[in-house]
UniProtKB/Swiss-Prot annotation:
Keywords: Amidation, Amphibian defense peptide, Secreted. This is Signiferin-4.3. It comes from Crinia signifera. Expressed by the skin glands. Inhibits the formation of NO by neuronal nitric oxide synthase with an IC(50) of 40 ug/ml. GO terms for biological process: defense response; negative regulation of nitric-oxide synthase activity. The modification Valine amide is found at V17. It is found in: Secreted. GO terms for cellular component: extracellular region. Disulfide bonds: none annotated. Signal peptide: none annotated. It comes from the Eukaryota.
Length: 17
């Protein structure tokens, strides 16, 4: 769901920082 996509996006952003 949207929560899964949001969580995945957060992980992606964190991995780039």
């Amino acid at each position: 769901g949207f929560a899964d996509l949001f969580g995945k996006a957060v992980d992606f952003i964190k991995s780039r920082v």
